[in-house]
Every structure is written in structure tokens, then in C-alpha cells.
Amino acid sequence: MAPQARAIGPTVVAKSLRDALEADTIILAVPFGEHREVAKALPSWKGKTVIDAMNALVPVEELDGLPSSAFVANSFTSAKFVKGFNHLVAATLAADPVVEGGHRVVFLSSDDEDAIAPVAALAKQLGFAPVKLGKLNEGGALVHARGRTWGQLIFQDLFKKEQ
């Protein structure tokens, strides 16, 4: 993974799953089909915040009719679960988020309002402008990439000026 991480940018560091699981906040950025294996790596996700940065390029039938984020959240039942950082390609996320006096937008959604605030703070610390899209099903409708039907905000590289 180290060569792939370096190809994305100098701030991306590859970690083993075991090392990553020691963190309180974990960005889930694996091939979509692997999320269940990651979920099995801990007996309980209590006390952990999981940020789902994946996109499921699978038919909705494979997701039990749920947005991909709600489907994935079912595997991390005791975690604080937030969908975010998924609507832009990795190279864009690795680039400087401050552009022409504005901050690159990242969208966040969660069914747990208490989980969003620390993830929004992390996004700001990284230089992004977090925009809350509501609950997982609301955000999922706006940023999904599924077959030929894509959400209106997927891959939109937006900027927010300081106010």
C-alpha cells in the first residue's frame, strides 16, 4: 500500500489495519466489498468514530435498498458513524484545500448528530469547509454514485469563501 499512498500525495501514510484500529477516528477507505472484513477486526466499535469515505459502485439491490452509507453503518453498529470525504477523488483530497481564498467543501452526513461535530472539526483542521447534508439517507441521495444514477453533488469540486 505504501506506493499507492505515495502516489496520492505526501500527506497520505499507509498503515496496517491493526495500527489504524488503535486510533479513535478511523477513515474507512477500502474497496467497498471489504468493509465487512474491517468491521470484524474489532469485537466492539464502541468509542470509535468511523468516517465512511467509500463509494459503492454496486446496484441498489445489493444494498438492501439502503444508501451505501446506511448499509455500511450496519456493520459498525456501536461506532459513531459519519459519511464524508467520499465525493472527491483521492488526488483532489490530497491537494491543498485552500484555493483562491476559499476552502474546498467536504460533505458530511450521519444519523448521530453528536458524531458530526468532531468530524467537521477535523475537516476544518485539515483546511476543508465541512457542509452537513443531514442524515445518512439524505446525504446519500445527494452524493451517491450508483450505475447510471448519480447524486447531484457527487464529484462536485466546490469551494466556500470565508465569511
What is the role of each PLM region?
Residues 1-25, 33-44:
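Conserved N-terminal Rossmann-fold NAD(P) cofactor-binding segment
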Residues 28-31, 54:
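Glycine-rich, N-terminal phosphate-binding loop of Rossmann-like dinucleotide-binding domains
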Residues 14, 80-86, 131-134:
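General beta-strand structural signal in soluble alpha/beta enzymes
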Residues 53-99:
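Rossmann-fold NAD(P)-binding glycine/threonine-rich loop
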Residues 41-48, 76, 99-100:
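Short, conserved loop/helix-junction motifs that constitute active-site signature segments
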Residues 22, 47, 78-81:
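A glycine-biased structural micro-motif
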